[in-house]
């Protein structure tokens, strides 16, 4: 009966999905705002530290997100106590079907959960939330420990109004009321109450969600999550069909199982990869005969979580013995082949045994780290050669879209989205994993694009782990044109990835490679960073930048958005690693940029003069 139960489980899961098809957390939104009440000598520096949104030294490039949303602040060093500061942050789906963002807080002397919630986070979170999301007892929080601080957020509700798409997470205070918040926000009391049903605005505590304004003072409209997906009715139809099919499979397979129990193994290999990978127990390559001849002890001893072990026979069969017609790419450590394995499209990287360090690096990272903007590892094989099996990402890599021929040019809004997705993937491995990982080979060729033109960071073969905020000394590794200056001395830190990401931002703007051929003469090459640095030195910086913007964009871009991305690229590629922003800052900056760029669609403008005005030309 064990087999029968295992088949019923996914069916029950599908039933639960059917009844919960209208999820409260169908999608995230690029940006939300936190209302931080200033008291007891709180400064922007404190807010910056607690909510991880850098101010200095990047405000010289006029890209500071806090100041953009607080035009009333004339001097960041002198702010009136008792006022509120709006702090932008990403609003993301969290486990448990709700929206929020996890900030990291380093515990200081005399900190308690209550003090952190009230004093350090201005009631944007609660003591109960901190206790629930951190392993430390309330009476013994270690000094310098890192706390996960959840701040909830909202992306709006089109059933209430489509006029509002940016929301402020607003902690209520004793002096607040429904009418006072309506006056200060410019939103009717009825709308506020409908966005916060059942909430008593006069309670003096708790969180409400208030429509917010963009840096131009306008209310961004709600962006429906349905535009890129399918309706609930379609989903319901698909689910019902799948359930019927699974019931039929249950009957056939269980009948065959009872008839011949020896065929149980063939059933195991028929389970879809995504299901099997999610439920595979942690195994060791040393046990169970998984190691093949020639496998090094280091490989044989690695522990693998949630990954499928494939046989060489199965991989060879799926690729016609690794026929060239199945080859879809070639990297520094091996070739990549397309395959269909157990009903799922996959990409197989075949590596020589000499690349065991790179194999282990990818295996260790991708079996422990899971994020929507990181490529998913399905499984591995260590017979004869080293094989890693990934999810197949249909649209190739970013470099192919920017530098290759035969593809439609990426619209500017998609370029900003790809930059934001990639930044979120990197922020995750830099900020939210223990230990912290440094990718060390960020480049456009290692950013994969799916069918919806969303990005996933891939190729973790050079990844190194470091202590939080730390660095390590290693050999210089990476790709020429993307390597930060300090890598010459073997220094590795998260700022190495930041530098390379800055080069990718320049690529998104110009569609040029990281190394540019300046003339037809032999040897006339220059780094893309140098090309942009030269443009920033020109008297007319804007005109100089226009000359290197991808000509395939034509007039279909808002110049202000391009200029701001170029300035962010400049901040990322500063020679001094300490002056580069963190990936957390970059995510907030790009979220802000995407929020303003996403509303811009040149296709809505038929008048050529309007098009020129919008593009800044």
Curated annotation (Swiss-Prot):
Location of Phosphoserine modifications: 266, 268, 274
Compartment(s): Cell membrane
This protein's record includes keyword Thylakoid: no
Residue span(s) of domain Protein kinase: 322-594
Membrane topology: Single-pass membrane protein
Modulation of this protein's activity: Activated by chitin-mediated homodimerization.
Tissue: Expressed ubiquitously, with lowest expression in pollen.
GO MF annotations, alphabetized: ATP binding; chitin binding; chitosan binding; identical protein binding; kinase activity; protein homodimerization activity; protein kinase activity; protein serine kinase activity
GO cellular component: plasma membrane
Transmembrane segments: 233-253
Topology, Extracellular side: 24-232
Enzymatic reactions: L-seryl-[protein] + ATP = O-phospho-L-seryl-[protein] + ADP + H(+); L-threonyl-[protein] + ATP = O-phospho-L-threonyl-[protein] + ADP + H(+)
Keywords carried by this UniProt record: ATP-binding, Cell membrane, Chitin-binding, Disulfide bond, Glycoprotein, Kinase, Membrane, Nucleotide-binding, Phosphoprotein, Plant defense, Receptor, Repeat, Serine/threonine-protein kinase, Signal, Transferase, Transmembrane, Transmembrane helix, Ubl conjugation
EC number: 2.7.11.1
Residues recorded with modification Phosphothreonine: 479, 519
Active site: 441
Binding site for chitin: 109-115, 137-143
PROSITE patterns noted in UniProt: LYSM (PS51782), PROTEIN_KINASE_ATP (PS00107), PROTEIN_KINASE_DOM (PS50011), PROTEIN_KINASE_ST (PS00108)
Effect in UniProt of substituting residue 138 to H: Slower chitin-mediated phosphorylation
Enzyme class: transferase
Main location: membrane
Glycan-linked positions: 40, 52, 102, 123, 152
Function field: Lysin motif (LysM) receptor kinase that functions as a cell surface receptor in chitin elicitor (chitooligosaccharides) signaling leading to innate immunity toward both biotic and abiotic stresses (e.g. tolerance to salinity, heavy-metal stresses, and Botrytis cinerea infection). Recognizes microbe-derived N-acetylglucosamine (NAG)-containing ligands. Involved in the resistance to pathogenic fungi Alternaria brassicicola and Erysiphe cichoracearum, probably by sensing microbe-associated molecular patterns (MAMP) and pathogen-associated molecular patterns (PAMP).
Annotated family: Belongs to the protein kinase superfamily. Ser/Thr protein kinase family.
Protein name as annotated: Chitin elicitor receptor kinase 1
């Amino acid at each position: 009966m064990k087999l029968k139960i295992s088949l019923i489980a996914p069916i029950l899961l599908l039933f639960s999905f059917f009844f919960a098809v209208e999820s409260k957390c169908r999608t995230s939104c690029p940006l939300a705002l936190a209302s931080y009440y200033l008291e007891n000598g709180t400064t922007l520096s404190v807010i910056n530290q607690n909510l991880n949104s850098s101010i200095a030294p990047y405000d010289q490039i006029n890209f500071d997100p806090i100041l953009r949303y607080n035009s009333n602040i004339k001097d960041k060093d002198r702010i009136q106590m008792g006022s509120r500061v709006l702090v932008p942050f990403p609003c993301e789906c969290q486990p448990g079907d709700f929206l929020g963002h996890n900030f990291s807080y380093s515990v200081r002397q005399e900190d308690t959960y209550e003090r952190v919630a009230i004093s350090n986070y201005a009631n944007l979170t609660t003591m109960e939330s901190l206790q629930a999301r951190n392993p430390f007892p309330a009476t013994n929080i270690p000094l310098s420990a890192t706390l996960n601080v959840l701040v909830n957020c909202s992306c709006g509700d089109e059933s209430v109004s489509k006029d509002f798409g940016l929301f402020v997470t607003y902690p209520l205070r004793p002096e607040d009321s429904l009418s006072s918040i309506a006056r200060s926000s410019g939103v009717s009391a009825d709308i506020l109450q409908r966005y916060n049903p059942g909430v008593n605005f006069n309670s003096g505590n708790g969180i409400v969600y208030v429509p917010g304004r963009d840096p131009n003072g306008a209310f961004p409209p709600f962006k429906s999550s349905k535009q890129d997906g399918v309706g609930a009715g379609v989903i319901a139809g698909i689910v019902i069909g799948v359930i019927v099919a699974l019931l039929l499979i249950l009957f056939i397979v269980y009948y065959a199982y009872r008839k011949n129990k020896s065929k149980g193994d063939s059933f195991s290999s028929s389970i879809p990869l995504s299901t099997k990978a999610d439920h595979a127990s942690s195994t060791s390559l040393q046990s169970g005969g998984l190691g093949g001849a020639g496998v090094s002890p280091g490989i044989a001893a690695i522990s693998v979580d949630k990954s499928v072990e494939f046989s060489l026979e199965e991989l060879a069969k799926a690729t016609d013995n690794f026929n060239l017609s199945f080859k879809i790419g070639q990297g520094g450590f091996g070739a990549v082949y397309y395959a269909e394995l157990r009903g799922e499209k996959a990409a197989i990287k075949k590596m020589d045994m000499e690349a065991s360090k790179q194999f282990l690096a990818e295996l260790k990272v991708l079996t422990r780290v899971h994020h929507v903007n990181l490529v998913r590892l399905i499984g591995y094989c260590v017979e004869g050669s080293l094989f890693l099996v990934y999810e197949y990402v249909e649209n190739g890599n970013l470099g192919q879209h920017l530098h290759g021929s035969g593809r439609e040019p990426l619209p500017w809004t998609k370029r900003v989205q790809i930059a934001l997705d990639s930044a979120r993937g990197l922020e995750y491995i830099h900020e939210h994993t223990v230990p912290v990982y440094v990718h060390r080979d960020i480049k456009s060729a290692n950013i994969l694009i799916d069918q919806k033109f969303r990005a996933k960071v891939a190729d973790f073969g050079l990844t190194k782990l470091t202590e939080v905020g730390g660095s390590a000394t290693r050999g210089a590794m990476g790709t020429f044109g993307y390597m930060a200056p300090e890598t010459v001395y073997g220094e590795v830190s998260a700022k190495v990835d930041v530098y390379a990401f800055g080069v990718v931002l320049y690529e998104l703007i110009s569609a040029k490679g990281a190394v540019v051929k300046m003339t037809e003469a032999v040897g006339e090459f220059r780094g893309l960073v140098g090309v942009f640095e030269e443009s920033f030195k020109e008297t007319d910086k804007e005109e100089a930048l226009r000359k290197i913007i991808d000509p395939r964009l034509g007039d279909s871009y808002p110049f202000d958005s391009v200029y701001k991305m170029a300035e962010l690229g400049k901040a990322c590629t500063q020679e001094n690693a300490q002056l580069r922003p963190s990936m957390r800052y970059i995510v907030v900056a790009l979220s802000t940029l995407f929020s303003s760029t996403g509303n811009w669609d040149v296709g809505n403008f038929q008048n050529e003069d309007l098009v020129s005005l919008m593009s800044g030309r």
